[in-house]
Amino acid sequence: MHSLRKTAARLGDMLLESDPLDLVIRATLLLLVGMPSILGVEWQYQLIIRSLAVIGILAPAAGRSAAFWWAMATIFFVKSVDHWWIQDNHVFLLNWWCLTLAIALSTADPRRIIAANARLLIGLSFIFAVLWKGFLSPDYMRGDYFHFTFLTDSRVSGIGTLLCGMDPLQYRHNYDAMGLLASYKAEVQSVQLEGTPVLRMLAVVVTWWTVLIEGALALLFLLPSKFRVTRGRNAALLLFAWTTYLAMPIVTFGWTLITLGLAQCDDGARRTRLCFILTYPLLLAYLLAPIWPMLNRAASALLAGSLGGAH
């Protein structure tokens, strides 16, 4: 155990002693290589972008070249124009990020430009999210989006089972109903989904929590650093990542935000930088580990033990 702790400490020191600019570039390249779903389903663009990213990892000098990132940004731009109507929003964000790296690496002070623009991209992402959700989508503010998601998305069924009294039969009914509605063979115009009042209440709570924390993040990252309140921006972004993606493991967007968060960290903020680095495997654990089923089994066992003890 002692040797394991020693190895982990040494690994942490190696990461923290890395050049911050190199760390950000490697994190971006790993994001592009390790998350194919972030690039969409078009194999041509995946092949080019991921191959370039592999080259950037294996040849660090290429990854620090402005020409490399101009090429990457150009490919992303062509992809965005070619498939704008089906492209996820985080791909547009990555397009801007590659352009940021290209411009920054063309200057004498790339670290400062990267940090400032990463902060700006985070703030703008959240302010536009709040604008769309809070002011332009009244159905969202009623909780309809999360209510529908909690009823029909298998990724969050564990939350409904553990916290809201949903059972597997209700979810199976909802999945079958949505499949029937989507089938071109069925002449069905509407279906009735099964839920619970607690699930509806949770949807409203999550809706307002999302708008509030995203609004706070927009404020923290767009305000100039001279305001004392901005000292909490990193903690707020980490809190958002640790809580949001536990409930909804959208790791692609989560890793993108964490990469931007890492990029805007002050060079002397070693502990904060380490927290951002450790968030990468944490979000991966959210995606791969059956966390909610394990919690459900633990809760069931605890309840059974309590009932047994009562008798």
Language-model features, listed with the residues they occupy:
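Hydrophobic alpha-helical segments and helix pairs
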Residues: 89-113, 117-118
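Membrane-interfacial catalytic/cofactor-binding modules of polytopic membrane enzymes
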Residues: 127-212, 296-305, 310-311
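Final/C-terminal transmembrane alpha-helix of multipass membrane proteins
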Residues: 276-294
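Functionalized membrane-embedded alpha-helices
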Residues: 26-36, 44-76, 99, 117-133, ...
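Membrane-interface helix caps and helix-loop-helix hairpins in membrane proteins
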Residues: 39-42, 80-91, 108-111, 243-253
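N-terminal membrane topogenic signal
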Residues: 2-27, 272-273
